[in-house]
């Protein structure tokens, strides 16, 4: 099984969730073993997608350094992971990725337009060898060894609309596109004013965010799935784990997880060299793992 990049360059435009300004995005092919690289054209600054370059996880996953930052990368990263893309350059002319419709389906469409190209180098994956867990009170995220990678996610909100939701996701590109990619980000009406006073969520609207009041959803079209909230958290988690640089072959379990806990989990994994093995998918090894790329 070979590493993948894009077959051609594709461009798009969307609104930034936090600043509310139009953002141009370009996805470009990269050579083998390059990984996922973000480039801010307005700063002439590159940022490799990796846990060590994460500087903030409060409202989104943010890459950066003293030169600047790129926020809200997780939806795009999630789509890139689902499509099995190993090497891609993401060019942005602003400090965040566009929110599109609040899900990752627009990025999936961009990747469909670009197509994929095989590179003459074996694909590598990260196989989890022992359990790694991060907790914050009763909240936790965990990776464990498995023969059938899944994501088991539970959320619990003190809100009548959301309440407690669980979803078990078995990884495949087809399953992702059908059941995860269209799940939108969500927020609470009571938080909007506070966020905007901090110059955040300025681009948020009913066109790119599910807005929840105490006992109703404000979006006139309603939900795309009855459990769209937990499905979106899975979308986010896939994007956050992609920062490890490989498709992760392990069971991910979360209760009330977050970008912050996901980031701490990726750091814990990389700290313990016995916790994982990087497996090159040569002809002799790919059979055991190829299902996850179906």
Swiss-Prot record:
Keywords for this protein: Hydrolase, Lipid A biosynthesis, Lipid biosynthesis, Lipid metabolism, Metal-binding, Zinc
EC number: 3.5.1.108
Catalytic residues (UniProt): 259 (proton donor)
Cofactor annotation: Zn(2+)
Pfam family, one: LpxC
UniProt GO molecular function: metal ion binding; UDP-3-O-acyl-N-acetylglucosamine deacetylase activity
Swiss-Prot/TrEMBL GO biological process terms: lipid A biosynthetic process
InterPro entries assigned: Ribosomal_Su5_D2-typ_SF, UDP-acyl_GlcNac_deAcase, UDP-acyl_GlcNac_deAcase_C, UDP-acyl_N-AcGlcN_deAcase_N
Catalytic activity: a UDP-3-O-[(3R)-3-hydroxyacyl]-N-acetyl-alpha-D-glucosamine + H2O = a UDP-3-O-[(3R)-3-hydroxyacyl]-alpha-D-glucosamine + acetate
A cellular component term, taken from the record's GO annotations: membrane
List of residues binding Zn(2+): 75, 232, 236
Biological role: Catalyzes the hydrolysis of UDP-3-O-myristoyl-N-acetylglucosamine to form UDP-3-O-myristoylglucosamine and acetate, the committed step in lipid A biosynthesis.
Family assignment from sequence similarity: Belongs to the LpxC family.
HAMAP family: LpxC
Name of the protein in question: UDP-3-O-acyl-N-acetylglucosamine deacetylase
Highest classification ranks of the organism: Bacteria, Pseudomonadati, Campylobacterota, Epsilonproteobacteria, Campylobacterales
């Amino acid at each position: 099984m070979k590493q993948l990049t894009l077959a051609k360059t594709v461009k798009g435009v969307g609104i930034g969730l936090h600043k509310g300004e139009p953002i141009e995005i370009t996805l470009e092919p990269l050579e083998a073993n390059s990984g996922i690289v973000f480039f801010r054209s307005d700063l002439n600054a590159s940022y490799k997608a990796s846990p060590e370059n994460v500087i903030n996880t409060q409202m989104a996953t943010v890459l950066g350094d003293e030169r600047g930052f790129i926020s809200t990368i997780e939806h795009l990263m999630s789509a890139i992971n689902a499509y099995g893309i190993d090497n891609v350059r993401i060019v942005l002319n602003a400090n965040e990725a566009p929110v599109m419709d609040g899900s990752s389906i627009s990025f999936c469409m961009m990747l469909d337009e670009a197509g994929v190209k095989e590179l003459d180098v074996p694909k590598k994956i990260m196989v989890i060898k022992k359990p790694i867990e991060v907790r914050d009170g009763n909240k936790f995220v965990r990776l464990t060894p498995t023969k059938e990678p899944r994501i088991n996610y539970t959320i619990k909100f003190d809100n009548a609309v959301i309440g407690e939701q669980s979803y078990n996701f078995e990884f495949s590109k087809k399953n992702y596109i059908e059941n995860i990619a269209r799940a939108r980000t969500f927020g609470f009406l009571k938080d909007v004013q506070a966020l905007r006073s901090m110059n955040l969520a300025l681009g948020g609207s009913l066109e790119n965010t599910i807005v929840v009041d105490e006992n109703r959803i404000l979006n006139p079209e309603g939900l795309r799935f009855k459990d769209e909230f937990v499905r979106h958290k899975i979308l986010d988690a896939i994007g956050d784990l992609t920062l490890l640089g490989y498709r992760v072959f392990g069971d991910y379990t979360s209760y009330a997880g977050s970008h912050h806990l996901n980031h701490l989990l990726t750091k814990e994994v990389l700290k313990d060299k016995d916790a994982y093995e990087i497996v090159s998918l040569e002809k002799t090894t790919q059979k055991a793992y190829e299902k996850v790329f179906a």
